[in-house]
């Protein structure tokens, strides 16, 4: 029984000494007492590999490489003592939550925090620390008693200790005799070690530790008392072992460990052998003088500069983290290719992995560098975790849209994603949730947008949706049925969840994913899919152990399980032997490195700016220490120990050290280098600091960019994008890519350098198949094409439509208004009422009746689905009431009366279509729906006007008509005039075309306004706007009071009865010219459609563009900055509109 301490600075050969000793013992004979190597858990695999190489034998059974926990498993297996169920960290957190919930009324300071996010985790962390340092509830009581004696029982610290003692004691009572707390594992191990026969006479080497917790120290003390010899290696300058080191000294952590171990051995009556001191220049740096100097003088003051060349050390300042990682990846590739280093001989080290993880993974994948990230893998993103969370949330939130489709899109529900997408569109369009999911009756909703004649349910599409719904929801419905409306225990809820996972075939699906990932070479993903099921089952088992017989509300169960899922992490092992390992300074263990890449050497990162503990402040820790309660080091001491971590990082490799730091973060905020950088410059004056920027290649150092074909092609594409001649080197790269099979796959990137965002016209055959003859078009489709041909192609050629949602959008409101105004006119006809004699009260009553009849048909009773939509219903009715007051005034003051409302013209309409001649063999039927066609007679001759309802004030823009962007009103009037013989039995004259805004305008006035004045102001705001026939008498048929009250139409009369200058009117010939122009422009646009034009060519008029509110921007990716992809600019007309219109028609006639 003896303790031996092996001391040496970094690289002095401590691990090598242990392995050589084991090799020598094995050479004497394979049989004998156990040889045990005790290492940190994350280092066991590496140690086994190093042992295999050092021993030089194919295998051995006498040597065991163990961590503390694995040692415990071996001891308990032989000596017993751990028969109770092992409660893991997650199970303990669940038990702690139950304890806190049961004793919440007894808590003081912690009571208001008990339900806060993260509180249970922090409390579990604190109790774990207490156990780690062998502090019992009785120890806390002892400190509290001192506080009471000194009248300090109401201090914050005393109140914390009181609550901690209460929770700690109750947790111990809860677990006692039932479960084994993971934080008691090492304490129990220390007690059982003497009873383990394989330890007696064993030789133990403890390597890779810089310090031990009191629990680990107790295990080591027990080992010393049983084993033949315990050898502990410490990274400590042997010359410093005879004195206690100050907290700021470099080797303070290991110096304290050295003295503690000697005290433990003496206390146990164990002989302490002479220290093995490994002095002199560490063997690791014999071929690297600069690294040797750095190791020897890093922690010494005053600094001694190195007079030689700083060969093997590079210091790089990078523009940002992405550039930093790319520069490191290029150097790793160079070392592998030119220096013949294997991947495993290089490692990437960071103090904080979080900001670098994704950058390292993505960059190394792009550079084809095999990589293993050394960390416990969080799995909150995994589909299985998402499935479990979503299933519970779906039941809790009564089948709300979000959790239901998160569940379905986990890819663990046996329904194809295409069918889930169809189901999702249907659910969103019809607002389905809650009992409508759980109801066994089929869904029956029409899909028509026509409020008056909705499409019948029960169609083939409806049957398909119901079949998908059944397959998608049947398992979740059974799960819901097992949980809803019942008081259940944790065991019963867990059983229902397990049944759901089994019914879905989750284990089989995960196994298949694992096989697929392995076949594709993604061994990390294969391990993840393989381990996640086991991890979840362990978590559920712990939950049942901790809370199986406890009655839980489902919400509480879900919160507890979610806490466990958040902390669930997988322990992946490197899937291959030859990989670059990336990890944190305090975790990674790679002793035989040839090159170390230390990234992120920034201020506040290395040394790290450590957060203060949430339970005990540094001042409180010092106070407890003075009272005899030893806990984890204070933040100040941990900050001093960061220096030691930095020392280990800088001395990890034999030949090559890369240090880098970013100058800015991802948002461009400036970052500063670590103070270590300044010290490095002082220690190594010959070290030249390099920069890695974001500039494009094209200079003297371009060879560094030729790392992989993919990377070279990417840089080449950026150079081509400059539009300048390529430098000679890159011309060679371009030629190589064209000639090499691998390089040809990268040509798509090269073409990006000369990218032009344009689409070729459709082939004639394809255009004929896409647009059947004769082509039927609506006027809005023509206007869309005039705005941008590609938008027309996507919307009407390919049929891409925005997803319909269960909401009242502007289109739905417009639909409602149109239907209400139509029904109003029809109700007048049914009752035989003259609109001109109708009072506002009578009109309001009819409108109210119309709204009552239409409201249920809008989006499947959406207006009665919530209080918010109930309020919207009132606003819709109020708007219609205001609008009707103005329309009533029109009827009272004019002779025009509705002849037809919401009347369709087209092949299947009430009126015949407009026929267009779009070229030889290209007949086009133009279809549409006119909101209102009004008629009045003068001297026995009928006059027609058309009215188009809009949601906002709109005027007839003749320039927009000329360009084909506003054809509706002229073509509506043309369709009405063409249909006049059918409607009236005789031809009719055009009276005008008008827009009417259906809205409830907000009138701003400084003072109070009377009822009549307010009505007049509303009429002025709701004036009809458009183009009227230049005939005062016809205009008076619309408003006989226009001379006195010009508040209905967009014009005024002079005192002599003539029209004022600038009035929007046109003579009969001009009106006919306008209608002919609109028809000719429509024919031209229709011809372009049939010709297959689909170019991305949005118009721009002033600040208005076709891209405004266009839903297809993500599809076309239009960017006016790309050469050749600018807007099609439409300016003001270069002359008189009527002359230009006549000229256009003349050119069309000649063509």
UniProtKB/Swiss-Prot annotation:
Q: What sort of enzyme, by top EC class, is this?
A: hydrolase
Concerning its family, UniProt says: Belongs to the helicase family. AddB/RexB type 1 subfamily.
> What phylogenetic lineage does the species belong to?
Bacteria, Bacillati, Bacillota, Clostridia, Moorellales
Organism of derivation: Moorella thermoacetica (strain ATCC 39073 / JCM 9320)
Q: Name one GO molecular function term.
A: ATP binding
- Enumerate the Gene Ontology biological process terms: double-strand break repair via homologous recombination
Protein name per its UniProtKB record? ATP-dependent helicase/deoxyribonuclease subunit B
The residues the record assigns to binding ATP are 8-15
InterPro entries per the UniProt record, alphabetical: ADDB_N, DNA_helicase_suAddB, DNA_helicase_UvrD-like_C, P-loop_NTPase, PDDEXK-like_dom_sf, PDDEXK_AddAB-type
- Domain UvrD-like helicase ATP-binding, by residue range, is 1-273
What is the role of this chain? The heterodimer acts as both an ATP-dependent DNA helicase and an ATP-dependent, dual-direction single-stranded exonuclease. Recognizes the chi site generating a DNA molecule suitable for the initiation of homologous recombination. The AddB subunit has 5' -> 3' nuclease activity but not helicase activity.
**Cofactor(s) required, per the database record:** Mg(2+); [4Fe-4S] cluster
Q: Does the keyword Metal-binding apply?
A: yes
Extra info from the record? Despite having conserved helicase domains, this subunit does not have helicase activity.
Q: Assembly and partners? A: Heterodimer of AddA and AddB.
Q: Which UniProt keywords apply?
A: 4Fe-4S, ATP-binding, DNA damage, DNA repair, DNA-binding, Exonuclease, Helicase, Hydrolase, Iron, Iron-sulfur, Metal-binding, Nuclease, Nucleotide-binding
Q: Which residues form the UvrD-like helicase C-terminal domain?
A: 282-578
Indicate which residues the UniProt annotation says bind [4Fe-4S] cluster. 788, 1107, 1110, 1116
What does the cofactor section's free text say about binding? Answer: Binds 1 [4Fe-4S] cluster.
> What EC designation does it have?
3.1.-.-
């Amino acid at each position: 029984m003896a303790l031996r301490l092996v001391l040496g600075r970094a690289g002095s050969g401590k691990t090598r000494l242990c392995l050589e000793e084991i090799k020598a013992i094995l050479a004497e004979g394979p049989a004998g007492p156990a040889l045990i190597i005790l290492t940190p858990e994350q280092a066991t695999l590496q140690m086994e590999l190093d042992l295999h190489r050092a021993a030089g034998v194919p295998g051995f059974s006498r040597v065991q490489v163990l961590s503390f926990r694995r040692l415990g498993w071996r001891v308990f297996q032989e000596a017993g003592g751990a028969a109770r169920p092992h409660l893991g960290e997650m199970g303990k957190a669940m038990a702690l939550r139950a304890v806190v919930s049961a004793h919440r009324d007894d808590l003081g300071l912690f009571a208001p925090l008990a339900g806060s996010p993260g509180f249970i985790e922090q409390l579990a962390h604190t109790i774990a620390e207490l156990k780690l340092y062998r502090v019992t509830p009785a120890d806390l009581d002892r400190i509290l008693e001192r506080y009471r004696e000194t009248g300090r029982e109401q201090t914050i610290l005393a109140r914390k200790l009181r609550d901690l003692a209460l929770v700690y004691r109750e947790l111990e009572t809860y677990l006692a005799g039932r479960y084994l707390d993971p934080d008691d594992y090492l304490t129990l191990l220390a007690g059982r070690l003497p009873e383990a026969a394989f330890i007696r006479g064993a030789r133990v080497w403890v390597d890779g530790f810089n310090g031990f917790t009191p629990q680990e120290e107790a295990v080591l003390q027990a080992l010393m008392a049983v084993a033949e010899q315990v050898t502990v290696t410490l990274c400590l300058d042997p010359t410093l072992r005879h004195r206690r080191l100050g907290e700021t000294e470099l080797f303070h952590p290991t110096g304290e460990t050295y003295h503690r171990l000697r005290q433990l051995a003496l206390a146990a009556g164990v002989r302490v052998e002479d220290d093995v001191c490994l002095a002199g220049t560490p063997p690791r740096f014999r071929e690297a003088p600069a690294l040797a100097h750095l190791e020897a003088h890093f922690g010494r003051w005053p600094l001694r500069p190195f007079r030689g060349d700083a060969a093997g050390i590079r210091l790089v300042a990078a523009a940002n983290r992405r550039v930093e990682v790319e520069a490191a990846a290029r150097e790793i590739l160079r070392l592998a290719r030119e220096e013949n280093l294997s991947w495993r001989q290089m490692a990437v080290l960071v103090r904080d992995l979080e900001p670098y993880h994704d950058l390292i993974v993505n960059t190394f994948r792009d550079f084809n560098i095999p990589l293993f990230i050394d960390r416990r893998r969080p799995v909150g993103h995994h589909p299985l975790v998402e499935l479990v969370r979503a299933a519970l949330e779906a039941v809790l939130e009564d089948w709300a849209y979000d959790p239901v489709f998160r569940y379905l899109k986990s890819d663990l529900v046996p329904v194809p994603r295409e069918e889930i997408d169809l189901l999702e569109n249907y659910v969103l369009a019809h607002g389905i949730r809650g009992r409508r999911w759980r109801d066994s009756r089929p869904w029956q909703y029409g899909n028509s947008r026509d409020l008056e004649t909705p499409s019948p349910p029960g169609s083939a599409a409806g049957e398909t949706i119901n079949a998908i719904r059944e397959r998608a929801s049947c398992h979740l419905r059974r799960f819901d049925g097992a949980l809803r409306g019942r008081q259940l225990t944790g065991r019963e809820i867990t059983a229902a969840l397990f049944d759901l996972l089994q019914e879905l075939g989750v284990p089989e699906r995960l196994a298949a994913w694992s096989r697929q990932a392995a076949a594709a070479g993604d061994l990390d993903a294969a391990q993840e899919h393989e381990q996640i099921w086991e991890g979840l089952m362990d978590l559920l088992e712990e939950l049942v152990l901790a809370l199986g017989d406890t009655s839980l509300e489902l919400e509480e169960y879900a919160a507890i399980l979610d806490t466990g899922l958040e902390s669930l992490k997988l322990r992946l092992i490197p899937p291959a032997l030859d990989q670059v390992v990336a990890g944190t300074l305090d975790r990674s263990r790679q002793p035989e490195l040839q090159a170390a890449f230390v990234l992120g050497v920034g201020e506040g990162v290395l040394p790290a700016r450590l957060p203060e503990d949430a339970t005990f402040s540094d001042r409180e820790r010092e106070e407890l220490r003075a009272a005899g309660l030893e806990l984890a080091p204070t933040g100040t001491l941990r900050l001093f120990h960061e220096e030691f971590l930095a020392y280990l990082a800088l001395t990890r490799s034999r030949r090559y050290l890369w240090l880098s730091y970013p100058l800015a973060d991802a948002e461009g905020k400036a970052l500063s280098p670590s103070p270590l950088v300044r010290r490095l410059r002082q220690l190594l004056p010959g070290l030249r600091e390099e920069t890695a920027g974001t500039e494009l290649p094209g200079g003297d150092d371009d060879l560094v960019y030729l790392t992989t074909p993919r990377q070279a092609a990417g840089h080449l594409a950026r150079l081509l994008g400059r539009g300048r001649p390529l430098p000679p080197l890159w011309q060679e790269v371009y030629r190589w890519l064209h000639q090499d099979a691998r390089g040809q796959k990268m040509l798509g990137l090269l073409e990006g350098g000369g990218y032009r965002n344009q689409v070729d016209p459709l082939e004639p055959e394809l255009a004929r198949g896409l647009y059947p003859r004769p082509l039927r078009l609506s006027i809005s489709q023509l206007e869309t094409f005039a705005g941008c041909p590609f938008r027309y192609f996507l919307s009407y050629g390919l049929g891409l439509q925005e997803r319909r949602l269960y909401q009242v959008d502007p289109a739905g409101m417009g639909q409602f208004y149109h239907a209400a105004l139509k029904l109003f006119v029809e109700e007048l006809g049914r009752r035989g009422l003259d609109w001109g004699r109708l009072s506002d009260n009578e009109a309001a009553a009819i409108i109210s009746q119309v709204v009552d009849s239409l409201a249920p048909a809008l989006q499947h009773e959406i207006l009665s689905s919530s209080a918010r939509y109930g309020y919207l219903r009132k606003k819709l009715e109020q708007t219609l009431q205001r609008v009707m007051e103005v329309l009533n005034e029109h009827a009272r003051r004019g002779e025009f009366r509705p002849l037809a409302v919401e009347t369709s013209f087209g092949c299947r309409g009430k009126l015949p279509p407009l026929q267009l001649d779009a070229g030889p063999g290209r007949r086009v039927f133009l279809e549409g729906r006119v909101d209102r066609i009004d008629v009045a007679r003068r001297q026995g001759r009928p006059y027609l006007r058309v009215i188009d309802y809009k949601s906002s004030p709109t005027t007839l823009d003749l320039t927009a008509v000329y360009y084909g962007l506003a054809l509706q009103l002229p073509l509506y009037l043309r369709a009405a005039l063409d249909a006049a013989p059918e409607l009236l039995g005789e031809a009719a004259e055009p009276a005008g075309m008008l827009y009417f805004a259906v809205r409830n305008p907000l009138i701003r006035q400084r003072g109070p306004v009377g009822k009549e004045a307010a009505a007049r102001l509303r009429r002025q705001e709701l004036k009809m706007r458009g183009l009227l026939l230049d005939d005062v008498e016809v205009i008076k048929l619309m408003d006989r009071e226009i001379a006195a009250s010009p508040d209905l139409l967009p014009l005024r009369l002079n005192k002599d009865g003539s029209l004022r200058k600038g009035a929007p009117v046109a003579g009969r010939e001009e009106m006919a010219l306008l209608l002919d122009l609109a028809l000719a422009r429509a024919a031209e646009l229709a011809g372009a459609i049939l010709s297959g034009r689909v170019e991305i060519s949005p118009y721009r008029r002033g600040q208005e563009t076709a891209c405004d509110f266009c839903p297809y921007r993500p599809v076309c990716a239009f960017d006016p900055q790309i050469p050749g992809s600018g807007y099609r600019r439409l300016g003001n007309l270069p002359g008189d509109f009527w002359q230009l219109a006549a000229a256009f028609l003349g050119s069309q006639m000649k063509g």
